[in-house]
UniProtKB/Swiss-Prot annotation:
This is Arginine--tRNA ligase. Its EC number is 6.1.1.19. Keywords: Aminoacyl-tRNA synthetase, ATP-binding, Cytoplasm, Ligase, Nucleotide-binding, Protein biosynthesis. It comes from Porphyromonas gingivalis (strain ATCC BAA-308 / W83). Pfam families: Arg_tRNA_synt_N, DALR_1, tRNA-synt_1d. GO terms for molecular function: arginine-tRNA ligase activity; ATP binding. Monomer. One of its GO terms (cellular component) is cytoplasm. InterPro entries: aa-tRNA-synth_I_CS, Arg-tRNA-ligase, Arg-tRNA-synth_N, Arg-tRNA-synth_N_sf, ArgRS_core, DALR_anticod-bd, Rossmann-like_a/b/a_fold, tRNAsynth_Ia_anticodon-bd. A motif ('HIGH' region) lies at residues 125-135.
Amino acid sequence: MSILQKLENSAAAAVKALYGTDPMEGQIQLQKTKREFKGHLTLVVFPFVKMSRKSPEATATEIGEWLLANESAVSAIEVVKGFLNLTIAPRVWLELLNEIRADINFGHKVATEDSPLVMVEYSSPNTNKPLHLGHVRNNLLGYSLSEIMKANGYRVVKTNIVNDRGIHICKSMLAWQKWGDGVTPEKAGKKGDHLIGDFYVLFDKHYKAELNSLMAEGKSKEEAEAASTLMAEAREMLRLWEAGDEKVVDLWRTMNQWVYDGFDATYKMMGVDFDKIYYESETYLVGKEEVLRGLEEGLFVKHSDGSVWADLTKDGLDEKLLLRADGTSVYMTQDIGTAKMRFNDYPINRMIYVVGNEQNYHFQVLSILLDRLGFEFGKGLVHFSYGMVELPEGKMKSREGTVVDADDLMDEMIRTAAEIAAEAGKAAEMDEEESREVARIVGLGSLKYFILKVDPRKNMTFNPKESIDFNGNTGSFVQYTYARIRSLMRRAEAAGYDIPSQLPTDLPLSEKEEALIQKVSEYAEVVSEAGHSYSPALIANYIYDLVKEYNQFYHDFSVLKEEDERIRAFRLALSEVVALTMRKGFALLGIEMPERM
């Protein structure tokens, strides 16, 4: 039982003993005491004033005196208006530190075969271009959320839906046919996803030129788009693909495999993975079957042009297209099919979609349509909606070829980390291989931390230069502190200093040492809240606060030079626990820790 839970129970017992009634749920409010006051935890007394029929100050004093007499964990009290500040006895903090050290899974719950199963969808790339900065935020959020849910005791299936079919894929295929001259990734000397992305950009370049030519002849933009032969060819290629044309399907398979090979390399570098990958080419037919079933059952309507729609006006929305007039499907069709397949494949208790906030309407509609089709799971879908990410230069547009590729960004971060380390002389004692590995860990860690420390629901600007800074709220600052603690522990081991498995509980502690133990003990609560609110940012910012407190402690107190053997062992044990907590927290963010920097 945590100190917080223990004192919540004792406060409830105090209210019952003093005022003859049990407090209602939520009335016991314990929070961390503000720095300007004495104490560790503060009880809000206002909810009990009606019971006591006394002033807030008198009520706080009564409850505080009862706790002093009946709860040995409380060593002192201070009343400030309607707030009761409680000081916890040093013995309790040392007992807690021993408990944390003994529990290798502290802060994490271990799933069993009976634990609820959560499926988390993230990444969802198109096979017509490489992953870009927007995908980086998506992948990092999805992976981190999955790890956080695991730490909260859930069984987790990480899944990816690859958008491997559709008009956008046909644009790249058509451009390769027309202007590719048989080029392959090997011939071009580049990753397959980048090569296919080049042809997507090339299609758009020729398409715009065609539109400009048609508009120069006097056509409006709409008329030019309708008259475009290039777009007509792309649509015909899509029709042939859906009809199973052998040549088109063979080309599609070949070019998609080039892209998959490229994606795999990017995912490996990024440090994300998946338990199950679905492909739109396999799920959209299931979706079409469901839409046609809904049409037969009168759930949907067919317009005069042959297109199929869902009328959502009774749900406060508008009409939603489900099948085009030519019978081809849309994203919604595929998502219906994918959802059905997933719930057939796994006993899912919660389905979480990690998708940007521009798709809020889409998932609102998907939930309604699945429910209308008779799937009970439709009501329980969770859209983890996150904000857009940009660079200081502005927005990214893949059609114009100005997108920031994930591969290029990661390479730049690793190079920058290596350069900064070299300038600071931090890599002087390392050989070339270790220097490269540390640069990789720090560069990617800085990228991940900078993105994940931001509230996922907010838009953000990623600044590569700001993200690698050995001071301030950055991943590299945390990693440097971790490496310093590991160096401290190696020196302690070399000096033969022993740390007993159980520390004595009669040691004198300073306020800063108590506060640091308290901060470590909050890890479990933060992990729980991060899972409840789907927020990796809570983990990131907690670790940063922990690091700040540790650095202040390290600045103010001797560790290796402490002459009192028992105090030295305590401070080493505390340092070790802080480092372990940092590593566990960063692992939930997908960030590695270097042993040296």
